[in-house]
């Protein structure tokens, strides 16, 4: 591991990453789950949500918004979070669900699915973004929560690594699109592959950049 990777992995988290967790504890909550998603803006594959419950007061060094971390560091922290969390839930919104009910509702569905898996049952949810979810639990939405809350940041890492692994598997099932490299986002090589090959069974057919290449069957 290089010195830069060591600093990235083992630097102490800012004190304010526990602010929202401490606030919830002062309000009487005892089991706090952080929730985040990965893949909302991609052109293919599922949107993946994760819900994470950490032991009260635990700070895992290096945990931060997954987008700020290198792939190797995310993988290392994924293993650390999975080993130390009280519970982790993962929910999925498939491309078909996204096309049927839209990406926002599919994301909310995946988040609710992730929460339903958790044991013990949380009594407070900290959710990245501005949308609550359909579960009968107290909830607080936090804009840019993946860089402001430790438990949300942990969930962002679980969601991101889980989805990246799924896209690597989809790359083997649907070769030619480069899913393993761009993870389904709309880079130039991906757009060219869609133009050349047409959408795959795991593309989001209602998304701009994909829908233009959907061909209707002849009647």
Curated annotation (Swiss-Prot):
Keyword Chaperone recorded: no
Gene Ontology biological process terms in this record: DNA replication, removal of RNA primer; mismatch repair
GO MF annotation terms: manganese ion binding; RNA binding; RNA-DNA hybrid ribonuclease activity
Cofactor stoichiometry and binding remark: Manganese or magnesium. Binds 1 divalent metal ion per monomer in the absence of substrate. May bind a second metal ion after substrate binding.
GO CC terms in record: cytoplasm; ribonuclease H2 complex
Cited Pfam families: RNase_HII (PF01351)
Protein known as: Ribonuclease HII
